């Protein structure tokens, strides 16, 4: 049976955020957020931005992702990541229907692509695997017979509880992935995965460095990302796309991996998922730590 563990520092942060949410005027917040969303949908960008700023004044921790929505409209500063409170709230609320929506409705199959590419390149089996942003255990399940020991990390407690029920992981933590990588003192891993994690992160340096610090030399780091046409970035390394998820320029991903000590084994163009029936372009990257 997996050991369902809580990572003390990130969990303390989550409890503080939950306590802060309890102090918010939820009725006022819902009214302000719905007003901002209606203005955004109407196409009144400037009014929507102002309304989302009012949302942030009520809820500085940003459980509704107002800062990300502002950035998706091309206004304000692009945040380095989606707010932890937003990510935890989003996935806690949707945990029960997550797999049905993501796999069945949005045609998300990245975990199986990970398995297929590892097998095609005859990589593995692996003694120790770290599954960052493990969610309900889709990637862990896809790799279960390729690994002796799998550790899963996710910011959403409800998602981790579902992963725990699957009996896929030896160890599970509720934690923000970069915080975990910074504080972890377990034995290093042979494979680190991060499927559907980068769309909630803008700047990648801390993630890539943390992964490297938790891996054996020669270990593999495999992750998916979303992207946009090169000219859309206008020289930027990353941006929030129209679907409120971070997209990363391929050049940025390549440069950061190399600078931190990874060699790219393979970078493949993929369809990450569908959004309103349209394919979302992305990459599946396999990198080896030097």
Feature locations, PLM:
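A short acidic, Gly/Pro-enriched loop at the edge of an enzyme's catalytic core
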Residues: 182-192
């Amino acid at each position: 049976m997996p050991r369902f563990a809580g990572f003390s520092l990130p969990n303390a942060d989550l409890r503080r955020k939950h306590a802060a949410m309890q102090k918010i005027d939820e009725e006022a917040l819902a009214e302000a957020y719905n007003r901002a969303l209606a203005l955004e949908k109407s196409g009144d960008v400037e009014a929507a931005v102002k309304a989302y700023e009012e949302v942030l004044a009520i809820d500085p921790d940003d459980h509704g992702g107002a800062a990300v929505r502002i950035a998706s409209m091309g206004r304000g500063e692009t945040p380095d990541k989606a707010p932890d409170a937003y990510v935890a709230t989003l996935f806690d609320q949707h945990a029960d229907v997550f797999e049905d929506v993501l796999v069945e409705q949005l045609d998300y199959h990245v975990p199986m692509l990970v398995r297929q590419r590892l097998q095609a390149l005859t990589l593995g089996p692996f003694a120790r695997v770290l599954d960052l942003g493990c969610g309900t255990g889709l990637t862990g399940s896809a790799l279960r017979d390729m690994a002796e020991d799998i550790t899963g990390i996710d910011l959403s407690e409800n998602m981790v509880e579902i992963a725990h029920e699957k009996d896929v992981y030896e160890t599970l933590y509720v934690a923000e992935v970069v915080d975990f990588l910074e504080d972890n003192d377990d034995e290093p891993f042979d494979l680190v995965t991060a499927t559907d994690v980068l769309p909630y992160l803008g700047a990648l340096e801390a993630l890539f460095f943390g992964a490297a610090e938790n891996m054996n030399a020669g270990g593999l780091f495999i992750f998916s990302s979303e992207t946009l046409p090169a000219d859309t970035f206008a020289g930027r390394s990353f941006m929030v796309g129209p679907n409120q998820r971070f997209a990363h320029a391929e050049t940025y991903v390549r440069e950061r991996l190399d600078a931190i000590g990874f060699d790219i084994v393979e970078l493949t163009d993929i369809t990450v998922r569908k959004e309103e029936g349209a394919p979302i372009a992305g990459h599946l990257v396999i990198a080896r730590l030097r």
